[in-house]
């Protein structure tokens, strides 16, 4: 690698709100999005909620000259909705589906059927290895009564672990997507603390766009006040996060968002605002010991957020086990009822009534059995994430007590930040 190596990486991210039969003006919005991406000529365009593979193929054909490489990440019954368009050849592709993703009986929310996931693409840019990730986490739906909070924390941890373990050979790491979390939310803090990723909005030298970088704003005609909840001025739930891993320094020169409409018309691309970032990457000479400046103060934030996350997962585990136990009792009660009905059916007097009641009783047992199995699986998934956090927390606490060997993510972050 040349000592004077540098490059600029222009990135586009958007939650497209492309739901067949439900989203408004899909065809027009996809057409305008394709025109805009061709005009701007980004290095990477990472999209979420493209839940129509036909629309992806439309964009792929429309963008083929500007973005010759593209990929659609498939998962679940409906699909992950994730896709990428790249001006540069994609060397490797991998997808990880989150193990916890809501509840199948909350069908009106639909997250469980989508197979929410994270997609990884590896690019080589003049010798530099870039790991780019695109993801979409579980929606919140209600700030006051968030029944999916534990699932979203578990997803954030799973995402952080995935990045942590797959980015060790990368020079630069980029994560874009709809995290469905506010900047100070537990899952967002957990993700940034464990991976060492920087928030482009916080770090940028030049920001232009909506107030406070909000990516859902009231002036967008597709956004209702119900979507914003207790935040009438807007919410920031879409992110561009980045870091340097090896002998590089990366910073966000510019960050722009749309402000309720696309830059070339008075209509929005989506109910979310688009993010457009320019990252500047340059070679940074290696330091003798990039970890010597790291101490207990830097580690304490990670320890604190891990403890809080484990507590929240514990509450989720207790809830999942309660539902599993309740459905278990229902199964026992239903089976007992079936035995009684079979006895009654053997007689002459109540045979017809018993046979009729057997049908809903069998249905009750089957439904309760499905609920039992699902919540047992949910409890195990939350326990797994909690156990992984405990392992990291124990190591970090011991290291803090010794006052040495800071965690790997922070060391890599510090090394990348040294210019």
Curated annotation (Swiss-Prot):
GO terms for cellular component: caveola; plasma membrane. It is found in: Cell membrane. It is an enzyme of class 3 (hydrolase). Signal peptide: none annotated. Its cofactor is Mg(2+). Keywords: Cell membrane, Hydrolase, Lipid metabolism, Magnesium, Membrane, Metal-binding, Sphingolipid metabolism, Transmembrane, Transmembrane helix. Mg(2+) binds at residue 49. It is a multi-pass membrane protein. GO terms for biological process: ceramide biosynthetic process; ceramide metabolic process; intracellular signal transduction; positive regulation of apoptotic process; response to mechanical stimulus; sphingomyelin catabolic process. Catalyzes, at least in vitro, the hydrolysis of sphingomyelin to form ceramide and phosphocholine. Also hydrolyzes 1-O-alkyl-2-lyso-sn-glycero-3-phosphocholine (lyso-platelet-activating factor) in vivo. Also acts on 1-acyl-2-lyso-sn-glycero-3-phosphocholine (lyso-PC) and sphingosylphosphocholine. This is Sphingomyelin phosphodiesterase 2. The gene is Smpd2.
